[in-house]
UniProtKB/Swiss-Prot annotation:
Catalyzes carboxymethyl transfer from carboxy-S-adenosyl-L-methionine (Cx-SAM) to 5-hydroxyuridine (ho5U) to form 5-carboxymethoxyuridine (cmo5U) at position 34 in tRNAs. One of its GO terms (biological process) is tRNA wobble uridine modification. GO terms for molecular function: methyltransferase activity; transferase activity, transferring alkyl or aryl (other than methyl) groups. It catalyses: carboxy-S-adenosyl-L-methionine + 5-hydroxyuridine(34) in tRNA = 5-carboxymethoxyuridine(34) in tRNA + S-adenosyl-L-homocysteine + H(+). This is tRNA U34 carboxymethyltransferase. Carboxy-S-adenosyl-L-methionine binds at K89, W103, K108, G128, D150, P151, T152, I179, E180, M194, Y198, R313. Belongs to the class I-like SAM-binding methyltransferase superfamily. CmoB family. Homotetramer. InterPro entries: CmoB, Mo5U34_MeTrfas-like, SAM-dependent_MTases_sf. Signal peptide: none annotated. It comes from Actinobacillus pleuropneumoniae serotype 5b (strain L20). SUPFAM superfamilies: S-adenosyl-L-methionine-dependent methyltransferases. Its EC number is 2.5.1.-.
Length: 320
């Protein structure tokens, strides 16, 4: 099983120390209600060697072992990594193995990074972090500490496997909770929420929860689905959106800016818009499920299969 005690020790003397009032008990309770396959996934983490490797986190997430793996070792490692499918966010280049994930998350990072306040020496929270790809890219930009939160047990095990293959780097940590379970810490210099807001039944509550984690003046990086329209435009899908049942609100950019200002954010601005392409989200050998092409109208890729506008994403920056 995953041992969170090193993280507790790590934050004990930082401005995150107040989290220790609630976090250990929350994670003990979490361990009692984990997914039925969690024990199997955690064993794969235990199997992974604590290897020494040359690490590149600046323009990709890559580990090159000082001693190259044999053909047999590569085959065995690939087998274990495949046991943790589906791999959704990446890609990873680990010990000579290319995990070609469903999402080219590096595309998103390249769109977001040029607009950010420098991440060097910052304490960062990544909400809905998935398997942690963007967390490692934040570390590559010099972040002092990156904490990701995501309640999905598979993502936790994927993250811990990657961590081991990156030499057990402790600058990034994944905590399997949702932001609604976090006490207001007001301790993070930058908070990321990318691909989360439209899954929330109460988007303004989510924005308020993000603000409660930021230091005064800290930067919010919000990436979410948007639609065209004015300040009063917001799509509420009747049932599914792109085959997803848990999509509740897709605002226009002006509507989203209004929401952010309403909960107290300042200096709110949109820095990027991009329609999701079939190059950025697609089926690979590391994903057995459907992907974007299956979610779009086969005769008109400007629409979802339900007839809504196809996914378009915006990046919004704001300050607490």
């Amino acid at each position: 099983m995953i041992d969170f005690r090193p993280f507790y020790q790590q934050i004990a003397t930082t401005n995150l120390s107040a989290w220790l009032e609630t976090l250990p008990l929350q994670l003990k309770q979490w361990e009692k209600t984990t997914h039925g396959d969690y024990a199997k996934w955690a064993k794969i983490v235990d199997f992974m060697p604590n290897s020494t490797a040359c690490i590149n986190l600046k323009d990709k997430v890559e580990s090159i072992p000082h001693t190259p793996l044999s053909v047999g070792e590569t085959k065995q490692l690939t087998h274990h990594l495949k046991q943790l499918m589906p791999w959704r966010k990446g890609p990873y280049h680990l010990h000579g193995i290319h995990i070609d994930t469903e999402w080219r998350s590096d595309f998103k990072w390249d769109r977001v990074l040029p607009h950010l306040a420098p991440l060097k020496d910052r304490t960062i929270l990544d909400v809905g972090c998935g398997s942690g790809y963007h967390m490692w890219r934040m570390v590559g930009e010099g972040a002092k500490m990156v904490v990701g939160i995501d309640p999905t047990e598979l993502f936790l095990c994927q993250f811990e496997v990657v961590r081991k293959l990156l030499g057990n780097d402790r600058r990034a940590n994944l905590i399997p909770l949702g932001i609604e379970q976090m006490q207001p810490l007001a301790a993070f210099d930058t908070v990321f929420s990318m691909g989360v807001l439209y899954h929330r039944k109460s988007p303004l509550d989510h924005l308020s929860q993000l603000k409660a984690q930021l230091v005064k003046g800290g930067e919010l990086v919000l990436e979410t689905l948007v639609i065209d329209g004015d300040v009063n435009t917001c799509l509420v899908p009747a049932d599914r959106y792109a085959k997803m049942k848990n999509v509740y609100f897709i605002p226009s950019i002006d509507c989203l800016i209004n929401w952010l200002e309403k909960v107290g954010f300042k200096n709110v601005r949109c820095v990027d818009q991009a329609v999701t392409t079939l190059e950025e989200q697609r089926k690979t050998d590391w994903l057995e499920n459907e992907s974007l092409v299956d979610f779009l109208d086969p005769n008109d890729h400007s629409k979802t299969i339900e007839g809504y506008p196809a996914p378009k994403r915006a990046v919004i920056l704001a300050n607490a």
